[in-house]
Amino acid sequence: MKMIGFEKPFKLEEGNLFKVYEQRKPTPENDDILVKVNSISVNPVDTKQRQMEVTQAPRVLGFDAIGTVEAIGPDVTLFSPGDVVFYAGSPNRQGSNATYQLVSEAIVAKAPHNISANEAVSLPLTGITAYETFFDTFKISTNPAENEGKSVLIINGAGGVGSIATQIAKRYGLTVITTASRQETTEWCEKMGADIVLNHKEDLVRQFKEIPLVDYIFCTYNTDLYYNTMIELIKPLGHITTIVAFNEDQDLNALKLKSITFTHEFMFARPIHRTPDMIKQHEYLEDITKNIESGHYQPTTTQVFEGLSPENLYQAHQLLEKQSMIGKLVINI
């Protein structure tokens, strides 16, 4: 099997250190399935992981994947060879930048049948992230009627996570306010279903003068930059969740006056620690498939590269590090 990996952490300005590696195709054990990978999607987390310590070389990144089940472990009950599946994987295992991959069935689901592989692969990592935010941290109802009258502010609505988060929030009855700054990103947010799109290059507090404070805020970009703004825009007893780690010290006491709940969302926590409820990721992906097939969600792929190669992977990382992507970037293997 072919893999694209690297021997040591590197920054892009050091040049392209991705290389092709070959190894024997693995055999699935326990609850693992062996997937022949058809397409992958590259995420910002790939660019961050590329710069982290390599404990076992070569490091093979890649999280989003779609492919065909080729073999199953003895404990597998959810899938059979021939099933077309999608998933987001885990950073503590070999990634999807390869022609074959082992993955636990608990974080996998059958892919939607009414869209292409290149479209479907845009959804697992960002979709699970958004589902965990809305249902595990915000604890919104699965009944849309019970969420009516509640609102969420999604910072950076045109990114990969923001794009699917907007659709999920609308599907389950929330009023959605997102942020963007360019005409094309504003139009994309509206296409995803946002009720209001604000300009995050301008003062958000001032733009909220005619908008009620929100119940929830989902920060998908630069938590440090928006920390104090989010505290101003959230309702008392509201809930803020971020997927972006702090790079500066922040005053947690600032949350006290409104009794704000603040949560970090990390969708890899379940597979890394093999939590007892890891199966939730399978269930969330199943719901994504159901909503794609029923027409409630749309895929978020905006760019496709042909062929898994060091050159394509390096170019994908370059595009993501510019932080101007709309939707998701996919590599068709």
UniProtKB/Swiss-Prot annotation:
PROSITE patterns in the cross-refs: QOR_ZETA_CRYSTAL
Domain of life where this protein originates: Bacteria
Keyword Zinc: yes
InterPro entries reported for this sequence: ADH-like_C (IPR013149), ADH-like_N (IPR013154), ADH_Zn_typ-1 (IPR014182), GroES-like_sf (IPR011032), NAD(P)-bd_dom_sf (IPR036291), PKS_ER (IPR020843), Quin_OxRdtase/zeta-crystal_CS (IPR002364), YIM1/Zinc_Alcohol_DH_Fams (IPR050700)
Keywords: Metal-binding, Oxidoreductase, Zinc
Key word Metal-binding present: yes
Record-level Gene Ontology MF annotations: oxidoreductase activity; zinc ion binding
Family (UniProt): Belongs to the zinc-containing alcohol dehydrogenase family. Quinone oxidoreductase subfamily.
Protein name: Zinc-type alcohol dehydrogenase-like protein SACOL2177
